[in-house]
């Protein structure tokens, strides 16, 4: 089964994140919500708190075929500031694996080259 990871930073856009999770799960794709904070509970840009499936340091990146970034402000800048995620994105891109982003989040890719 395909495996995807979507990353949550404080201020993520709730609709963008949950829509991706919902659609992929309906399609039979295994997707985990991954917190890049030290807490599994992450609050979005509209003060809705979601409990992530896993913290970044516990996520199994080797099993994933796709890394996905939701948009949102300040979520996008917070994702961009998380160095371990940026390194994983660069590695995935170099390996030809799927990296995807919604709305404001493609700006993360533009700064990674």
Give the location of each predicted region:
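Short, thiol/selenol-centered motifs that function as redox-active sites or metal-ligating centers
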Residues: 102-103
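Extended, subdomain-level signal for the structured scaffold at the beginning of enzyme domains
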Residues: 1-95, 107-111
